[in-house]
């Protein structure tokens, strides 16, 4: 019998962040590096620390997480997966409350033209709208 599909809210409660030492090169990160594996909750919390109206690349965001956690790098694969979870969860929460107050501002890191944005279950132009609104209000 197939398992019930997890909701975005359930996916937000993934394993806690942890670190690994790479046994071999991975995604451009050399063997022996200390790699931070984040979590959706940590990513959501970190997104909230990016100032209103600011935009940051995913690469810069990963470097920031790595530095904060005293690691050489943050896993690019899990970061992308977790960012998508945060974005989808945020979208659901926005639709249930019609307010972005208190939500994780993933649009400060996710570009509307990015491959990740194309996978989201909503129109990526909403990302541009949020960026424009923040620009006007900052």
Model-derived segments and their meaning:
Residues 3-6, 11, 15-138:
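Nucleic acid-binding interface residues in structured DNA/RNA-binding domains
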């Amino acid at each position: 019998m197939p398992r019930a599909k997890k909701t975005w809210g359930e996916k937000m409660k993934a394993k806690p962040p942890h670190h690994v030492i790479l046994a071999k090169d991975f995604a451009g990160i050399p063997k022996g590096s200390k790699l931070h594996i984040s979590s959706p909750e940590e990513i959501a919390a970190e997104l909230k620390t990016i100032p209103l109206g600011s935009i940051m690349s995913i690469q810069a965001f990963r470097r920031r997480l790595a530095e904060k956690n005293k690691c050489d790098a943050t896993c690019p694969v899990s970061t992308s997966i977790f960012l998508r979870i945060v974005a989808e969860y945020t979208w659901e929460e926005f639709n249930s409350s019609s307010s972005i107050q208190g939500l994780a501002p993933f649009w400060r890191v996710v570009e509307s033209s990015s491959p990740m944005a194309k996978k989201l279950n909503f129109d990526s132009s909403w990302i541009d709208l949020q960026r424009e609104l923040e620009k006007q209000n900052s």
